[in-house]
Regions:
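Interfacial helix-loop-helix junctions of multi-pass membrane proteins
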Residues: 135-142, 166-170, 204-231
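Hydrophobic alpha-helical transmembrane segments
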Residues: 85-100, 175-183
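Membrane-interface loops
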Residues: 37, 44-56, 103-194, 242-246
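Aromatic-anchored segments of alpha-helical transmembrane domains
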Residues: 31, 35, 121-130, 201-212
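N-terminal transmembrane-helix/juxtamembrane module of multi-pass inner/ER membrane proteins
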Residues: 2-93
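Alpha-helical transmembrane segments of integral membrane proteins
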Residues: 13, 17, 21, 25, ...
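Hydrophobic transmembrane alpha-helices
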Residues: 183-187, 228-236
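Membrane-interface capping segments at transmembrane-helix boundaries
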Residues: 2-7, 236-246
């Protein structure tokens, strides 16, 4: 093997074709997402009914605290900036970068990480079709604020974002779900105690960010966390059963 080939082998655990295939998988998922988005967007009245149901349920539980959280965050320009960037970057940029990092640095963990994200997101997308839900920012009469619309130059009406996002995708919170999956996987592969602590805190911070920007109810966040844990458990048990019968 030539020196160049040896260096490429070290950089790419399974070669260029395998890496390209991973990108194709995510492109396929994006196509599926757009199809689901189109289906969920049609039932606008249902999305608002479901959003009101979530609000009334939380109110009945005595836990409609999101407007209070929003007022606290909106009083600080630093918190508004941090939570806004977290909302925009956590689901795609952070997920994408951690996938690449695990692919190159801990390749033996990559397939499990990828599969967990894909399965959990597909289940979440089914939820968007069955239960489209308008987010808090669409209910100003309840005291919610569209933080991104008021304070950020990038908001849900911005060109590419308006095209690519689903406005009625509150339940469950895929931001929170993905953040928990990323946090668990990264906790398992990083070495320093500080890094482990930061990755454990990551899903909690993302949950706080999506609530404080008016994009999710706390029930959405809880549902996202539960979905992440359930799909992870199912995949783990499936893998163990497969190994036993191998």
């Amino acid at each position: 093997m030539s020196t160049h080939a040896e260096q490429t082998s070290r950089r790419l655990p399974r070669g260029w074709a395998h890496l390209a295939f991973q990108f194709l998988i995510w492109m396929g998922f994006y196509v599926v997402y757009q199809v689901v988005r189109g289906a969920a967007d049609r039932d606008v009245s249902g999305a608002f009914r479901n959003g009101e149901w979530v609000i009334e349920t939380q109110q009945h539980l005595g836990a409609l605290f999101e407007p209070t959280v929003q007022r606290f965050v909106d009083s600080s320009a630093i918190l508004v900036t941090l939570t806004s960037y977290t909302y925009w970057l956590s689901q795609f940029a952070v997920v994408g970068l951690t996938l690449l990092w695990v692919y190159f640095r801990h390749h033996e963990r990559f397939a499990g990480f990828r599969n967990w994200l894909i399965v959990a997101n597909l289940v979440g997308l089914v939820g968007y079709i069955l239960v489209p839900t308008a987010p808090p920012r669409m209910f100003p009469e309840w005291g919610f604020v569209d933080t991104l619309g008021q304070y950020s130059s990038i908001n849900h009406d911005s060109g590419l974002i308006a095209f690519a996002s689903n406005p009625y995708a509150a339940m469950p919170s895929l931001h929170s779900m993905d953040a928990l999956i990323v946090g668990i996987v990264m906790f398992g592969v990083v070495r320093s105690k500080l890094a482990k602590a930061l990755w454990l805190a990551w899903p909690l911070w993302v949950g706080f960010a999506v609530i404080s920007t008016g994009n999710h109810y706390w029930l959405d966040v809880a549902a996202g966390f539960v979905l992440a844990l359930l799909t992870g458990l199912v995949l783990s048990r499936t893998r163990l059963l497969r190994l036993r019968h191998a």
